[in-house]
Every structure is written in C-alpha cells, then in structure tokens.
Amino acid sequence: MSSSTTPDLLYPSADKVAEPSDNIHGDELRLRERIKDNPTNILSYFQLIQYLETQESYAKVREVYEQFHNTFPFYSPAWTLQLKGELARDEFETVEKILAQCLSGKLENNDLSLWSTYLDYIRRKNNLITGGQEARAVIVKAFQLVMQKCAIFEPKSSSFWNEYLNFLEQWKPFNKWEEQQRIDMLREFYKKMLCVPFDNLEKMWNRYTQWEQEINSLTARKFIGELSAEYMKARSLYQEWLNVTNGLKRASPINLRTANKKNIPQPGTSDSNIQQLQIWLNWIKWERENKLMLSEDMLSQRISYVYKQGIQYMIFSAEMWYDYSMYISENSDRQNILYTALLANPDSPSLTFKLSECYELDNDSESVSNCFDKCTQTLLSQYKKIASDVNSGEDNNTEYEQELLYKQREKLTFVFCVYMNTMKRISGLSAARTVFGKCRKLKRILTHDVYVENAYLEFQNQNDYKTAFKVLELGLKYFQNDGVYINKYLDFLIFLNKDSQIKTLFETSVEKVQDLTQLKEIYKKMISYESKFGNLNNVYSLEKRFFERFPQENLIEVFTSRYQIQNSNLIKKLELTYMYNEEEDSYFSSGNGDGHHGSYNMSSSDRKRLMEETGNNGNFSNKKFKRDSELPTEVLDLLSVIPKRQYFNTNLLDAQKLVNFLNDQVEIPTVESTKSG
C-alpha cells in the first residue's frame, strides 16, 4: 500500500494558521505561539477561537477550527461548537460543508451531541408551517438517521428520545388516514426505543403504557405484553451498564466560555486518566459479551460506537487507540485509525510501531521510514524545548526538569533503536546503517543504548564482531564515564570471550566511572568473570582492589556474588536465605540495575488494584461526614435561610445536574493559574 492511501488532512491550508502574520499582535499572537509550541493543546485552540469571536474575526475562527480538525478529526465537541457558532450567525452554506466533513467518509463522527446539532439544522431548514407534510417527512428521516447512527447505542440518550417523541406527538393530523399513520409511527418508535438500555427508560415505559390505554384499552394489553419482556431486559442491562461504568467521566464544554482542563482531555498518565481508561475498557469488554443478543453486524456497530466514544474522551491514550485499531480487521482501515491516532499523539512509540507494522505488511518501506521520521522529529523538538527551558532557568524545579530531559532522551533513543532494527528487517543492513548515521549526528542527545543496539545488530547480521567493536569504541568517546555503558560493553566482550579486550576496557574505565553503584557492578562483573574463566589469584587481586575502594562492603556479599549462576545468587537463595532478596535478584538478572527506570508503565492488574484502592470514580474511600464536621459560617448562614423542601410540591432545582455542571464546566481558579494568567 503506498503512502498516498493514507488519509489526507482535512484542510490543506491549515498549516498557514500556525505561522503568525505581521498584522497579528497582542493576545492573538500569544495564543498562536502557544499553539505553535504545543499543537496538541486543545484548550489553547479554544481560547484562541474565543478571542477571535470577540473580535468578530470569523474568517480566522474558521481557519483555526480547520487547523484543529486536522489534528483532532474525531474530537466531536469541537465540531459541535463550530456548528453552533455558524448556526447562530445563520451561515447555512458553511454549516452544510462542515456537516459533510464530520458526518461522512472515513472521519465520520458518531457523537450524539454532534448529530443532534445536525438535527437542529434540519429542523431549522424545514419549517413545518410552510413546508407541511414534505418538511415533516424530511425531519422524520433525520430523526431516524440519528437514531441509527448513535442513539440506539448510547446509554445516555434520553434527550434525543424525548425530542423525537415530542415531535411525533405534536403532529396534528388533518384526517383519519394521517391519524392512523401517526399512531403507527408512534408505536414503531416506542417499539425501537423501549428495547434500548438508556437513562429515563422507566419513565418512557410508563408514558408508553398510558398512551396505549388512551389509544385503545382493548388492544393495549396485547401491545404492552409484546414489548414487556424486551423492556425488562433493557432496564436490567442499563442498570448493569451503570455498575460497569461507575465513575465514567464524559464531560465536554457546552460553549467556548466553559472550556477548561476539567472538561477537555488532558495528556499524561495520571491516576485519573488510568482509572478512566480502565472504565472504558470495562465498558468495551461488557459490550463484547453481547448481552443484547444483537446480530453480528449490529454488535460490530455498537462496539465501534463505544470505541469512537472512547478515543474522543481518551484522545491522548495510546492504549485506547491501539485497542480500537486491533478491533478493526482490515489492514487499510487499521492504518487510517492509527494514522489519525498519531495526529493527536505524534510522539507515541507504540502507535508509531504499530502503524509501521501495517505499512510493512504492504511492503511500503517509504511509509515505514516516514512514520518513524515523524515520531523522532517530534521527540527531538520536545527535547530541545525542554533543554531550552532548563538552560534558561525558567523552571525552578531543576531536578524534575533534568529527569524529564533524560526521559526524553531515553524515549528518542528507544524509537531510533526500533527504527534501525525495523529497517534492517525490511531493507537490509544498508538501510539500518543509514538510520544509525542519523543517530550519530545527534551525538550526546541520544543515550548509549543506540550504540549497544547497533553493535548487536552488526554482530547478528553476519557474526561481524569487528564492526561491532568499532561501534562500541565510537560510543566510548561519548560515554567513557557512564558505568551503565561500560557494563554493557563488558557484557558484549564477555559474550564473545575477548579476554584481553575485557581487561583493557576494565583498566581504562575503572578510574573514570563516577557512579559508585555502577562501579561496584563493574568490579563484581570482573570478579565473577575471573572466577569462571580466569584464575583465583586474579580474583583475589580484584577483590583486594574492590575492598580498598569500598571498605564498607560485606565480605560474604561479594563472595556470594561471584558464584552466581545465570545472574542468580544461589548461595543466598539456597543457603543464606536471610540475605536473599528475590525482587533484587530478578531485577538484576533481567539486565536492569542501570539506575534509570524506563518510562512509566502500569499493567492492567496494577490498574485494577489502583481502582480498588481509590474506587471506580477515582476518589478515595467515601467516608460520611461526621456530624461535628466544621462548615464555613457562610454556608451555615445560607442553609439557615433557605426554605425547607417540604414547602415545595416539585423540585425547582435538580441538585445532581447542578453538581455535574459545577464539576464539568466550572474551573475554580488556583493561586498558580491566577499568577500565570
């Protein structure tokens, strides 16, 4: 498959938006620069759009939306906000173009709020007073389309069903034929709706039974009986779904003013993001069980709907995108999903690797190379940005920034290593050496791993240890003080049984390595080597030097370590069991112990444990407030003057909706945000 089959960006002109022009100043310039620095910061786009709308620069608003959709084509709330803005200005021609882009083709969105906006547009364009029966038919078709696309799959769809039902009930027929047609349509509507597990289902059932009684009390029992079993099943499944998805957050801004970090997806692997990801995966697992007994085609549509909802709210989760792509069976469709995923996550190694595999299956080496190049360029740009911040001293937390910088180096090196091995697999050693040539230009930016990886690649290719030695010697120029690199170099030499070179490397490096932990490992490695393949006098000589350097070390500790078998300390394990540390043993036997841990990783079992500790909703165990818990005086004063609830026959305020609104749409300013603002 050629690279031309990869889905094009929606708007070819979008890149122009990122470059500020000469006539842009002040807040607009600052917001554009923020987007340029971080093209995946959703909130920055919305802040810029909101600013441009206050300036009534609607042409610029459309340009920024275009740029945004190029990066996040499946983020439906942005399409919805844009459509609502255009509808408010009666820009119907623009609305039609936007609807064609976001509701059809490979980038079709399936969000109910977005489709409801489409429904609003259809109802505005088809006036029942002037259009009559023809307009009603068009609107009914639109309702049915929205129902088929997403409403029948969405558990939180009561607003749609209410709107559809009210529309049918408001129909005033002119004759008996139209009256019968209306009854048939309502009955068909109820039949479809009451089989769907969704919120407010019980109220709809009561409404239906009352309606049947009003239409014909003689036939009511028959029709109600036919639907009763399906309704009971749907009601039970909705309750089950609520339990499975307890704590799921699906907040999105209702307008540009309410957009904040609480209702917009945020990158990173925070506890909250991990918990939300697990809930989404639980939902998908539940759908796969097919408790609704759907046909294979309908089940596939329903699962796809949930996946698309998942990637909308977990847009920065590589695992969610990966799972969705693996659910797709066709390689070309999988490529489209992964390509779109990398628009929002251009620095994701896992998504890059998976997309490159898809291209490799089509023997498209050019696309494989382009895929890796985009990822490495993104990671390199991020590294330079972090390094610039560290050097300028903008962040006081220098230690944290240094750690972040090293993590970025690790990540970039890791991708280059996989890139190199992939090109060797696809196009041979020459292509791999080309990639290594790119790595050499980066010198100290990359970690030593790229030299070690290339050395093994050269050796495995045709047992060419001479080239491998040259590579490792080249790495020694930059990492001669790095104990981790020296240890790995020694491992390679020991593997090839190059005795003289082993001893030379040890003697030239032992005084240069500053990290005492790694220096200990180098000594112990040499002691173990001499114990197995050298002579006892050399062992004693090395031990003497070791204890002169580390006099506090335990004698028997060093003794047991030189009798390790396959990196396992069996003396401790089998005899001196009180000294044995299984975790430490397995850690070092797996080739770790370099003092730098890899990127953050959490298994599904760890996620489950974390959720059990914090609860599905991400809060720690909910303890009831004590009766004597202190409340602010202002709150107590307010409670004392509010009328008691028994004075009102109906609820004037839905407390839960108010709480949800405050949680999702209102961001309470912090001291830090006030200062930065």
From Swiss-Prot:
InterPro entries: HAT (IPR003107), Rna14-like (IPR045243), Suf (IPR008847), TPR-like_helical_dom_sf (IPR011990). Transmembrane segments: none annotated. One of its GO terms (cellular component) is mRNA cleavage factor complex. It is found in: Nucleus; Cytoplasm. Keywords: Cytoplasm, mRNA processing, Nucleus, Repeat. It comes from the Eukaryota. Gene3D superfamilies: 1.25.40.1040, 6.10.250.1660. HAT repeats lie at residues 56-88, 90-124, 138-170, 181-214, 257-289, 298-330. GO terms for biological process: mRNA 3'-end processing; mRNA processing; response to DNA damage checkpoint signaling; RNA 3'-end processing. GO terms for molecular function: mRNA binding. Component of the CFIA complex, which is composed of RNA14, RNA15, PCF11 and CLP1. Interacts with FIP1, PFS2, YSH1 and probably also with RNA15. Probably interacts with the phosphorylated CTD domain of RPB1/RNA polymerase II. PANTHER family: CLEAVAGE STIMULATION FACTOR SUBUNIT 3 (PTHR19980:SF0), RNA CLEAVAGE STIMULATION FACTOR (PTHR19980). Present with 5350 molecules/cell in log phase SD medium. Component of the cleavage factor IA (CFIA) complex, which is involved in the endonucleolytic cleavage during polyadenylation-dependent pre-mRNA 3'-end formation and cooperates with the cleavage factor NAB4/CFIB and the cleavage and polyadenylation factor (CPF) complex. This is mRNA 3'-end-processing protein RNA14.
